[in-house]
Amino acid sequence: MASALRQEGLTQEDYIEIQRRLGRDPNRAELGMFGVMWSEHCCYRNSRPLLRGFPTDGPRILVGPGENAGVVDLGEGHRLAFKIESHNHPSAVEPFQGAATGVGGILRDIFTMGARPIALLNALRFGPLDEPATQGLVEGVVAGISHYGNCVGVPTVGGEVAFDPAYRGNPLVNAMALGLMETDDIVKSGASGVGNPVVYVGSTTGRDGMGGASFASAELSADSLDDRPAVQVGDPFLEKGLIEACLEAFQSGDVVAAQDMGAAGLTCSCSEMAAKGNVGVELDLDRVPAREQGMTAYEFLLSESQERMLFVVQAGREEALMQRFRRWGLQAAVVGQVLEEPVVRVLQHGSVAAEVPARALAEDTPINQHTLISEPPEDIQEHWRWSETDLPSVSRDHDWGADLLALLDDPTIASKRWVYRQYDQQVLANTVVPAGGADAAVVRLRPQQGDASLRGANRGVAATVDCPNRWVALDPERGAMAAVAEAARNLSCVGAVPVAVTDNLNFPSPETPKGYWQLAMACRGLSEGCRVLGTPVTGGNVSLYNETRADDGSLQPIHPTPVVGMVGLVEDLGRVGGLAWRQAGDAVVLLGVSSDERQDDRVGLAGSSYQGVIHGLLTGRPPRVDLDLEQRVQALVRQAWEQGLLASAHDSSDGGLAVALAECSIASGLGVDGALPGDGVAPERRLFAEGGARIVVSVRAECMDAWTSLLADEAHAAVPVTILGAVADHGRFRLSLGSQPVLDQAVQTLTERFDQALPRRLGTA
């Protein structure tokens, strides 16, 4: 029995509770059902109490947490569905298929709501890129994402990629998707109508993906390579047909409820639909389209074969609906019915193979109780004692240009063109700002069907994914709050008003005091950031146990990584901007926190890229997040875009102000003549310190009078404004500290280092 419980990821206490709920011992199929549905991946048994603290209400929220995806009202008939999810463990053992099926799964969450997918983003984390093992993972994951997205015909428009030893052996692959509603009514997943048929559509069921949900809820080890059968195999061309057939079916009015079959397959779909509708579902496995012979009830119920959906259909309309799917070359079969008794009853070969109360699987699931320590762990407190004065002193003739080049060569900061050039960013012809051109992607709001498709298509949605994982490692609360702030800042830099959030909480085990403290503090910071910035959480994903067991038995946890996916509204696509300088003579201005004060705790080198790349350190307490100033700085930038005063906007984040300015020059090929304030402040702080509420803008030379008038507005009086210099056409990147020149590099030199960092390491330069 002990080995059977381990196989299902259950404890002895879980087994006793299962016996109590059933009033008997479970059979193998039932034990498997409980194993996947009581896993962290499906029921959030460690994180659910923390998630309840997230703000989830707002004037634009149509659907919040609990459905396949969140939905927000963007006005003028535009309703946007969006969601982020992880496929971390599968991608670690089978990078191509793990990443590809992660894309397929998040797309199904979107179109299951009745929305047509319009864009994809991803947030990726890997170990050091100089290591061959990491290079193989990167190549496989990027190829998998590219393959599925390109084939299914949905553009991948943005994302982020970071490299750190903490992710060695346990990469993070988070996929986000956006979709525009095409149905009048949002499709929900709660079953209703006793006697209504349950219809299976899509691909056939095989043995691939067996136990994927339980696999995703355990740490990785050297033996995990043997778990390749737990990784699903995707077919993007079949999914393309499934998208079209589902959207047609939803328009017909014949579908009562819909649920995609992702983690835990048929078990999850049946139990969630039944529990949400307070009804039951009877499932006959003999009717399920199978691709393999002799499959047991256990295998049918736990298979995670891809591109499958489960519908509850209006009685009498099932044949017409199935004909619709068959025209698209898809399987379709009536496999059960809605019951009044609130159970999931599974039949096979004329007998009951399993019968479990639906709520026991999908609603009334266990919660693991953890005690939150009252003080930060001792190692964190030790980190917080670090001071910038502990850094090695530098000589007066120190080569700051070499430091800047080293930062631009860091794979986390460097150009990700090697990644996004493999993605089709322009399919559907709605991508306005693609990856690499700005701090957020922008996609035109142009539905293919419905009244909204007939209106002018001059509105857009902006999207971004962000997480400063080095900050979160040192202070989870500040780091998670900074993730929300940076996401909103990135949207504001393209002129978008932040609307709502979907989150992906990637963490190590919560079963240690430090692990649970990290998770709890990050949730607190994320919640506060969303509350103050007015961006409610519409749903997301929790991925725990992201850690690798070494050969000596020790566990190597990842950095806690709460990825924030945020969407924003662009009212006028003619006022969207990027990060590149536009013309010589434009003023270069820093809005927000400057680096010219030693004691300002809103900016610093703790946890910075400079600290890591130049000194090999990760220590200190990250800067305090000033959410009030964030709001003010972002509002000023958005209004300046609206008035047509700006030529560019770019947030200062990884690498600090010097790197932000360099990225603007690299993107444009134009030079800059700039001077940073702060006499008496260490040069490294002025050049490379990081902090929130900092945006570099270039103001059109012909708009300086209007810019001055805007700054005089009382609403913007509290925003610090620092004139740094001007855009130049001499092709040099020149910065001085006061009157002392410290950087004078050819923009071409910066560009070559920035562009070649990934290709050189991957052998494709």
Curated annotation (Swiss-Prot):
ATP binds at Y44, K83, D503, G540. It is found in: Cytoplasm. It is an enzyme of class 6 (ligase). Monomer. Part of the FGAM synthase complex composed of 1 PurL, 1 PurQ and 2 PurS subunits. Mg(2+) 2 binds at D109, D260. GO terms for cellular component: cytoplasm. Substrate binds at S86, H87, N88, H89, R108, Q232, E304, S305, Q306, S543. This is Phosphoribosylformylglycinamidine synthase subunit PurL. Coiled coil: none annotated. The active site is at H41, H87. The keyword NADP does not apply.
